[in-house]
Regions:
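PRPP-associated nucleotide enzymes
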Residues: 1-182
């Protein structure tokens, strides 16, 4: 539940940067002016690890369209290899996108996922939301994404180790939430 709560808090923080418009709202006692989102952002998460964090965002942006990415890290060797196996999303053209993944380690899975998404359109802005990030991952994203974007994280940890894990990090987010993979 704590990861969901962090998703709700991060969603609120990001919502403060989204475009709003003023609108008349009817109440039982009259009419009031209120600020409402111009359009709800599209929420996209990397499955399995991202699902609890994503749920917090969905609790906050409860009218948002949703997308899902199936990506995983291939173990072994000196390089990080990201396998992208699944992509399902509504049209992202000219929309605000929040890409939700709890761990921003090397940044390669974020960039690979974004490049796959951009084959289907270009968003007006991309918000990258993580729980824990490594400086190397933030640097990689800044050097390799050309679309308007911002990075949001709950914690910036020290570094990546030789196996490209965040140190001190929190371990495998998917395993922590759901148990070890087979």
């Amino acid at each position: 539940k704590n990861i969901e709560r962090l998703g709700q808090i991060m969603a609120y923080e990001i919502s403060r940067k989204l475009p709003y418009l003023r609108k008349s709202v009817e109440t039982p006692l009259g009419t009031a002016r209120a600020s409402v989102l111009e359009t709800d952002p599209i929420l996209i998460t990397v499955m399995r690890a991202g699902l609890p964090y994503f749920q917090g965002f969905l609790d906050f942006f409860d009218r948002s369209d949703c997308g899902f990415i199936g990506a995983h890290r291939k173990e072994g060797g000196k390089e990080v290899v990201i396998e992208l196996e699944y992509l399902a999303t509504p049209s992202i053209s000219n929309r605000q996108i929040i890409l939700i993944d709890p761990m921003l380690a090397s940044g390669k899975s974020f960039v690979r996922s974004v490049n796959a998404l951009f084959k289907h359109g270009t968003p007006s802005h991309l918000y990258i939301a993580s729980l824990v990030a490594a400086p190397e991952g933030i640097k990689f994203i800044e050097e390799n994404l050309s679309v308007a974007h911002s990075i949001w994280t709950c914690a910036l940890d020290d570094k990546l180790n030789d196996q490209f894990y965040i140190v001190p990090g929190l371990g495998d987010a998917g395993d922590l939430c759901y148990g070890q993979k087979l």
